[in-house]
Amino acid sequence: MSITQYLLKYLFILILFSGLVSNEMLADQHIKHQALQIDKEENSLSILSWNIKMHSPPYGWFYNSIDKAENIIKTLKESSKYDVILFQEAFSYKIRNKIYNSLKDLYPHQIDIKDETNFYKMNSGLWVISSIPITLIDNFNFTELRHNDWLSSKGAYLYSVIKSQQEFYIINTHMQADYRTKYSYIRTSQYTEIQQKLISPNENSEIPLILCGDLNISKPSKLNQMLEKLNFMNGPLSGKLKHTSLGNNHELLDYILVKSKKIKFQSIERRILNMSVYLNIDSIQLSDHYPIEGI
């Protein structure tokens, strides 16, 4: 055997071994993560928040929505079971119906989108399915929207769930995106509107309040302004992933926040999940966002 052949053979063995080790590490990570969830107390609440980018035709045709929906269904069947799954950009009724009908044995409850939209606008895309009973308390559409967001009915939904005799309030929202123009001031008006219409009416309540969704806020200073305004708390992220967008910028845009006064949460673990490992596919074949979980 020549030196060149020997080196090629050695390189092949090295690549094969590194691939096996990498897959074993990923599998071990998910086994440990699932075991951690099983160990959680029964009265804890498990939440998954995911921007799934499911547009109605004709826009959805360009993003392989049907194939991506099937991948999302498969991953949610393989992953840990959650009490509540909150979706953003679930604009397509056909896709929502497909996902719900495929998962209703695991998640028998849903609250479909209930927006007052104009004929030329999309709905809010804010949808929820759950393994426990869930009730819609209130919802509204933002007054201020800019650029392409003006063609949607973005807003916020307030839900109630009860687990082990403990009630929780959960807000699902999707705020203004940035385009060539940065729209931080629009997002400020939007979370102020959330405070006025959904948070303040429940200010004196002893019910724990959680805010989830795609906030489109990547700068820590801007997030801190929102947290201070609403009296909410963020927390550290477990795991290796520290961003939720799959774009070139790798930004953290999606959050699970909790009310910081009156209500004291014993603990909450946040983790950004690469769900593609369940199917051995590229993450973009699911969505352009990673989901974030809170337990």
Where does each model-flagged region fall?
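Surface-exposed cleft-lining segments at the edges of enzyme active sites
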Residues: S56-W61, N141-D149, M175-R187
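Metal-dependent phosphoester-hydrolase catalytic domains
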Residues: G19-Q37, I199-I210, N216-I295
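Structured beta-strand-rich core segments of catalytic domains in phosphoester-bond hydrolases
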Residues: D28-I38, V84, Q88-M175, E269-N274
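Active-site beta-strand/loop signature of hydrolases that rely on acidic residues for catalysis
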Residues: L45-I52, I72-I99, I129, Y159-S160, ...
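Alpha-helical scaffold elements lining the catalytic groove of polysaccharide deacetylases
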Residues: Y63-D67, K182-I199
